[in-house]
From Swiss-Prot:
Annotated crosslink Glycyl lysine isopeptide (Lys-Gly) (interchain with G-Cter in SUMO2) location: 251, 593
Sections of the chain in a coiled coil: none
Family: Belongs to the nuclear hormone receptor family. NR2 subfamily.
Residues covered by region (Required for interaction with NRIP1): 589-608
Zinc finger (NR C4-type): 114-134, 150-169
Keywords, ordered alphabetically: Activator, DNA-binding, Isopeptide bond, Metal-binding, Nucleus, Phosphoprotein, Receptor, Repressor, Transcription, Transcription regulation, Ubl conjugation, Zinc, Zinc-finger
Protein name: Nuclear receptor subfamily 2 group C member 1
Positions of the UniProt region annotated as Required for interaction with KAT2B: 1-179
UniProt GO cellular component terms: PML body
Length: 608
């Protein structure tokens, strides 16, 4: 690669003089030339073709071909012709061309350079001028929330030829040069031409519909929240979150937000709560209670002749007590895994060599785990959405997506040796106490994959429709709306922080090992695990983000907001339309007793 000094010698041979370069000072680059070594050289400054002085021009790259020097402006607008002239802008000029050897990139054509790698740019992508390669790399990394690691010292050279060697440094360079992650969040799948476009619809390029009558050939009627009750509701409209939906039936007070579509058969698929509860319908049937006339009419109006939904509602009424749920899930576990032990092992079982009991000053035995609390295997959080995606978004699809996230969170907790070492009773108590916090963190982590923004906007639309139809009280709607806005604000704040997989794993561990829930046993041991998670978390951030002094504080300050999320409302929004009045608390012990192989083959897939 030719250096400035080599170019200078070439110019001397061409009798153009000697170039002596100085470091950029202020807003200009100074170049001194001298045709004769015995005479004083003239001073030249960089200027535009029209004689005006540019703000700043920097060396973009040096081509391997001798004699080529490429300059560009900081905004990558591209500089094709560079003129060196005297400060008084006299007619004496020394002209350099960026590339005069190519017919495609001649002096009359301006081309942009990628701000990340220096390759030829194809346009402005996500806020900066980049090439197609860096554009696609950045989009994949942000959409899938990929976690990279650097094998070097996190200062790898990123250029056209070496940009694929270190993905970590390449992504950090994309962010450092101003590529906006929020721009990636706004992209959606293209709208089908056959679908009706509404001028009221926001800028989202993906329309998801909810239909009440499966047999209706009509397209969904667009409805939007126009109530000025809160400014935040209008803010959702401005952000392009709302979608076209059909007016949906809603239960009063107990509030089923959307009428269910006909569910795809899920027999034999134990990946979601829907399939588990459906299987229990044949295992845990008791006497058929006679519903009152109001409930029957409401079920008929919601189901619109959908017999599968009617049977699910009947099953919901059959399982009113936790005892029924427990017996049904126990029966299911035995039927699925005869003679096999459950996934949740007793304290210390299978942990030889990793976990040791230490007797303290008192009679309490403390568990000390060798090595880190979390390993690299706990960073990956892979979620597969239900497939195929229905043409019309319905309660079953939302519920199954949420239940897959719930199962995946349970599986993640079970994979931590320290969690299993606490014993089955403590493990169940911890998950029952903090499943809502873990689920909410999962929503933020899977924000893009689950399309959470659209789901929340759908909830808001349905609540607005139900209020207009007098199917829900204003007080109840306000309570649900406040919860939705809390979810929205929390997830948005997490997305803006650009949290990686390691940070999400440690945040979940700190939440999971919280000793302040009443009824927990061995709280001192749980607190020790939480302290260990915090120390490892602090060490990771210090090494990974040495220049971000307050990053740890910002992340930890997001955790108190999780305690403001009402678990009952979360159940109502995401799960009630799928499993009715069966509480998540009653389901958790049976999920933890199931072998992970019975459900994780369906919920584990694409990396988040």
């Amino acid at each position: 690669m030719a250096s400035i000094e080599e170019i200078a010698h070439q110019i001397i041979e061409q009798q153009m003089g000697e170039i002596v370069t100085e470091q950029p000072t202020g807003q200009k680059i100074q170049i001194v030339t001298a045709l004769d070594h015995n005479t004083q050289g003239k001073q030249f400054i960089l200027t535009n073709h029209d004689g005006s002085t540019p703000n700043k021009v920097i060396l973009a790259r040096q081509d391997s071909t001798p004699g080529k020097v490429f300059f560009t402006t900081p905004d990558a607008a591209g500089v094709n012709q560079l003129f060196f002239t005297t400060p008084d802008l006299s007619t004496q000029q020394l002209q350099f061309l960026t590339d005069n050897s190519s017919s495609e990139q001649g002096p009359n054509k301006v081309f942009d350079l990628c701000v990340v790698c220096g390759d030829k740019a194809s346009g402005r992508h996500y806020g900066e001028v980049t090439c197609e390669g860096c554009k696609g790399f950045f989009k994949r990394s942000i959409r899938k929330n990929l976690v990279y690691s650097c094998r070097g010292s996190k200062d790898c050279i990123i250029n056209k030829h070496h940009r694929n060697r270190c993905q970590y440094c390449r992504l950090q360079r994309c962010i450092a040069f101003g590529m906006k992650q929020d721009s990636v969040q706004c992209e959606r799948k293209p709208i089908e031409v056959s679908r009706e476009k509404s001028s009221n619809c926001a800028a989202s390029t993906e329309k998801i519909y909810i239909r009440k009558d499966l047999r209706s050939p009509l397209a969904a009627t667009p409805t939007f929240v126009t109530d000025s009750e809160t400014a935040r509701s209008a803010g959702l409209l401005d952000s392009g979150m709302f979608v076209n939906i059909h007016q949906s039936g809603i239960k009063t007070e107990s509030t089923m937000l959307m009428t269910p579509d006909k569910a795809v058969s899920c027999q034999g698929d134990l990946s979601t709560l829907a399939s588990v509860v459906t299987s229990l319908a044949n295992l845990g049937k008791t006497k058929d209670p006679a519903p009152n006339s109001n409930e029957v009419s409401m079920i008929e109006s919601l189901s619109n002749g959908d017999t599968s939904y009617t049977s699910v509602c009947e099953f919901h009424q059959e399982m009113q007590t936790n005892g029924d749920v427990s017996r049904a899930f126990d029966t299911l576990a035995k039927a699925l895994n005869p003679g096999e032990s459950t996934a949740c092992q007793s304290s210390g079982e299978g942990m030889e060599g990793n976990v040791h009991l230490i007797a303290g000053d008192s009679s309490i035995n403390y568990i000390e785990k060798e090595g880190p609390l979390l390993s690299d295997s706990h960073v990956a959080f892979r979620l597969t959405m239900p497939s195929p995606m229905p043409e019309y978004l319905n309660v079953h699809y939302i519920g199954e997506s949420a239940s897959r996230l719930l199962f995946l969170s349970m599986h993640w907790a079970l994979s931590i040796p320290s969690f299993q070492a606490l014993g089955q009773e403590n493990s169940i108590s911890l998950v029952k106490a903090y499943w809502n916090e873990l689920f909410t963190l999962g929503l933020a982590q899977c924000w893009q994959v689950m399309n959470v923004a659209t789901i929340l906007a759908t909830f808001v639309n349905c609540l607005h429709s139900s209020l207009q139809q007098d199917k829900i009280s204003a007080e109840r709607r306000k309570l649900l709306m406040e919860h939705i806005f809390k979810l929205q604000e929390f997830c948005n704040s997490m997305v803006k922080l650009c949290i990686d997989g390691y940070e999400y794993a440690y945040l979940k561990a700190i939440v999971l090992f919280s000793p302040d829930h009443p009824g927990l046993e061995n709280m001192e041991q749980i607190e020790k695990f939480q302290e260990k998670a915090y120390v490892e978390f602090q060490d990771y951030i210090t090494k990974t983000y040495p220049d971000d002094t307050y990053r740890l504080s910002r992340l930890l300050l997001r955790l108190p907001a999780l305690r403001l999320m009402n678990a009952t409302i979360t159940e109502e929004l995401f799960f009630k339309g799928l499993i009715g009045n069966v509480r998540i608390d009653s389901v958790i012990p049976h999920i933890l007793k199931m072998e992970p192989a019975d459900y994780n083959s369906q919920i584990i897939g694409h990396s988040i």
